[in-house]
Swiss-Prot record:
The lineage of its organism: Bacteria, Pseudomonadati, Pseudomonadota, Betaproteobacteria, Burkholderiales. It comes from Paracidovorax citrulli (Acidovorax citrulli). This is Melamine deaminase. Changing D328N: Loss of activity. High atrazine dechlorinase activity and loss of melamine deaminase activity. It is an enzyme of class 3 (hydrolase). GO terms for molecular function: ammeline aminohydrolase activity; metal ion binding.
Amino acid sequence: MQTLSIQHGTLVTMDQYRRVLGDSWVHVQDGRIVALGVHAESVPPPADRVIDARGKVVLPGFINAHTHVNQILLRGGPSHGRQLYDWLFNVLYPGQKAMRPEDVAVAVRLYCAEAVRSGITTINDNADSAIYPGNIEAAMAVYGEVGVRVVYARMFFDRMDGRIQGYVDALKARSPQVELCSIMEETAVAKDRITALSDQYHGTAGGRISVWPAPAITPAVTVEGMRWAQAFARDRAVMWTLHMAESDHDERLHWMSPAEYMECYGLLDERLQVAHCVYFDRKDVRLLHRHNVKVASQVVSNAYLGSGVAPVPEMVERGMAVGIGTDDGNCNDSVNMIGDMKFMAHIHRAVHRDADVLTPEKILEMATIDGARSLGMDHEIGSIETGKRADLILLDLRHPQTTPHHHLAATIVFQAYGNEVDTVLIDGNVVMENRRLSFLPPERELAFLEEAQSRATAILQRANMVANPAWRSL
């Protein structure tokens, strides 16, 4: 039995009462929160280890509700100035094909280093390069070592609507030197591979790794494939996820919105999490709410690619579970939940011309308890409550940018940079303390970053991508 106690911190619990407890303690035993209290009212039990949190804020770990991890090695140049399908076919797919398993291992470690340093403890990795041999094994090995909580949502594509081919051909003409790649699979093959993946990895790493099926988008997956994913999630008591209405092409191809299309086939349910939802109207929001569908909003990515802004306030007003996802590392160019929270608040204030449209408290909820709800994991993570997993972060607000501070939620959302995250626990294990990562010691970090840079350059060269074009002011 291992015990750990965090003492004399300010707890932002995110429990149902949203209690904020000053000068408080949290007691952790075997990876779970077993007790908490205020020092003036109770005495913490003895512990094997005590972390002094004086001057710090203790929060549930941030939850990255939708992301693509490997793509972090494709950032830094080739993605800029491209909209979604241009980016997909001229950068993402060729770049993924040019990656080797050793590159994937480096990408996952780099991603986790940046994520943990910004307070992210859970990631929903939509793995769209899992089709390539060795990539899954490379990723899982690093995830197990690093200690993050991971949903490995294995994506699949089992059809492509022929009407989009002319559009793709035109986009390819912009980068003719880049090879056109296909990640299509036969439906039966995708089913077998995802089933085997779940059998091997779901529940491993002390329960930190989960496996979901992830049909990519409605125009690229058969109804058979989506029905199978829905049944798989139900039978194995997991969730399933897909990208929805990230562009307006989905509606053009279906002659109705993707939400309407899925409802026609009975595919909207409480185990489904949909990402993006940019091209949504009130009917689409109503359909998702009616079926208790969960949502992940990638606000920075949608802006980066010029896609638009999802109607998040309308979803929040209905009480829907909406989490925040940083999306691909190369269509956000950072893995910083605090930065994405700030952008979420600002873009909706601007679009709605309403300075109170999403409160800082709600934004913080979206990064914690609502993110957990969007993953169907709110019974285990997302708040500081007895019985839940000890995924906790300590923020030190004694920085110039967070001084002065009075309103904690507003300070975290609008003033913080991310470097205020001092200590991170996942399952009660300390994976970062004093900003030192357990899985990337300081003496190894520079050499590792140089290796990541070298591998990224080699990937772009193999894919014939131009990463540093001529200076362009217009």
